[in-house]
A protein has these predicted regions:
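Aromatic (Trp/Tyr/Phe) and Gly/Pro-enriched flexible surface segments
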Residues: 22-117, 126-130, 135-145, 152-232
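Terminal processing/anchoring signals of secreted or surface-associated proteins
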Residues: 281-284
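Short, solvent-exposed mixed-charge patches
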Residues: 288-289
């Protein structure tokens, strides 16, 4: 039997693999469109099942379906300002920095499946500062927990370090549109809830003046929350001959190599001085994707 050259064997193996599945959002009702009833006042986050307020803070649900007699929680115009939903007709609302000392509001939801250890996930949520806010803050984050964090019988800052957080001293001042907060994390394993809010007390929360005159502090809308398995990206591959190539992790393993991990490159080389030409893998790369 005639032996296939190495590259053709690799192409044949890749061709037999199933196509990668589309990313699945593990956050149920991440766009806040499903509800058990239209909101009629503030503090009704729980109608956007399965979202809850995990502490004594009174987080809100706003939706365009709110009756006209309850305009305070309507969309796009509501008591805190004007902002169309990023998608659909609903979103959540929280106070992450208040005129009341160390008062915090959070939103929490269970994931549809626990995160798998050592797997990269892309975590995203979007925020918009309400027009009437007299303050804006710099850090809003998402904490992925094992089990729920609530119920907590007070409303102070939760004592957790969020895996995803907007940068310190980069203030979330956009009140005319939405700001994406996102990062790729590597799961420890078992995380099955997501909590969004400000995880810092007043002393460690930087503020600037907001666009409005509401004396209550900073109010933010939250929409389109997602946690998805991260799409594989090129990384360093340590091949059996000790050389380094940049390729997808699936290509690397089929070539008998060891992936260097997300973000790794061949400069400086992690495994050898000789770098294979990336272009030689172009056909494989196209087929794998």
């Amino acid at each position: 039997m005639r032996m296939l050259p190495g590259r053709l064997m690799l192409l044949a193996a890749l061709g037999s693999l199933p196509a990668p599945a589309a990313a699945v959002n593990l956050v149920p009702n991440g766009n806040f469109e499903s509800n058990t009833g239209c909101p009629t006042s503030f503090s009704q986050l729980s109608v956007a099942v399965p979202w809850i307020a995990p502490t004594a803070g009174t987080s809100d649900y706003l939706n365009a379906c709110a009756p006209n007699v309850f305009p305070s929680v309507n969309v796009p115009q509501n008591e805190q300002g004007y902002e169309p939903a990023l998608s659909g007709s609903g979103y959540a609302g929280i106070i992450p920095r208040s005129a009341a000392a160390d008062y915090r509001e959070y939103i929490e939801a269970p994931l549809s499946a626990p995160l798998v250890a050592n797997t990269p996930y892309l975590v995203r949520f979007n925020v918009s500062l309400a027009d009437d806010s007299n303050l804006a803050i710099d850090r809003l984050g998402a904490y992925l927990s094992v089990g729920p964090v609530g119920p907590v019988p007070n409303y102070v800052a939760l004592p957790y370090t969020p895996q995803v957080e907007s940068p310190a001293n980069t203030f979330l001042t956009n009140a005319n549109g939405w700001t994406l907060v996102s990062a790729t994390i590597v799961a420890s394993g078992g995380e099955d809830h997501i909590v969004i809010g400000n995880f810092h007390d007043d002393a460690n929360t930087a503020t600037v003046a907001g666009p409005g005159q509401w004396p209550g502090g900073a109010y933010y809308y939250v929409d389109d929350v997602s946690v998805e398995v991260a799409t594989p990206t090129d990384q360093a591959c340590c091949l059996p001959n000790g050389s380094c190539a940049v390729m997808l992790p699936g290509e690397c393993k089929l070539a008998g190599g060891a992936p260097g991990g997300p973000g790794s490159t061949c400069t400086p080389s992690p495994c050898g001085p000789t770098k294979l030409r990336k272009s030689s893998w172009g056909t494989v790369k196209t087929m794998y994707r």
